């Protein structure tokens, strides 16, 4: 059975095909055994293929379908009280400035490092607020996942379209 951290690992693997488990765990703020376990679960689910030389390749079609339509149901959002933290969903930096993006949602991952106020949401990865500073592209993907998990129909469709573009760019870049 997949765990929430597996979603972050899957999104990380889109751009980091042959990264070591040590590097992945440092970037995501998880243990090496958690990173390895996530890749094993993702492989069992048919969302990645382990490479003989190390690392894993994302199965783009199934992974995109899972992100777009499975994650919002498998990992329903856990809303928290108002908090100060790191913006997520459409309140995330860079997402609300898209020309055809829906109005931003005031969602934050609670964190002492954050400077935004809003409704708290439990992140898929406990270290997600710190991940925002370490890997801005992964932060954008995790924020889009939260938009899928919490947004209205228009917001979800916008997030799906952006994910299609991200997965297509990753597919082209990995060939």
Model-predicted regions and their roles:
Residues 13-16, 42, 145-151, 163-166:
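Generic structural signal for hydrophobic core residues of well-folded globular domains
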Residues 74-159:
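Exposed, interaction-prone assembly regions rather than primary DNA-binding/catalytic cores
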């Amino acid at each position: 059975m997949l765990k929430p951290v597996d979603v972050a690992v899957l999104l990380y693997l889109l751009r980091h095909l042959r990264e070591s488990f040590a590097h992945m765990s440092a970037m995501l703020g998880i243990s090496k055994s958690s990173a390895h376990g996530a890749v094993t679960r993702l492989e069992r689910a048919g969302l990645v293929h382990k490479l003989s030389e190390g690392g894993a390749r994302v199965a783009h079609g199934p992974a995109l379908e899972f992100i777009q339509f499975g994650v919002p149901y498998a990992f329903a959002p856990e809303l928290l009280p108002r908090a100060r933290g790191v913006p997520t969903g459409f309140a995330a930096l860079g997402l609300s400035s898209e020309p055809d993006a829906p109005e931003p949602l005031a969602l934050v991952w609670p964190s002492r490092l954050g400077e935004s106020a809003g409704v708290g949401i439990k992140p898929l990865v406990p270290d997600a607020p710190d991940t925002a500073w370490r890997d801005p592209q992964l932060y954008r993907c995790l924020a889009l996942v939260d938009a899928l998990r919490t947004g209205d129909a228009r917001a979800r469709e916008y997030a799906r379209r952006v994910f299609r573009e991200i997965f297509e760019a990753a597919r082209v870049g990995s060939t």
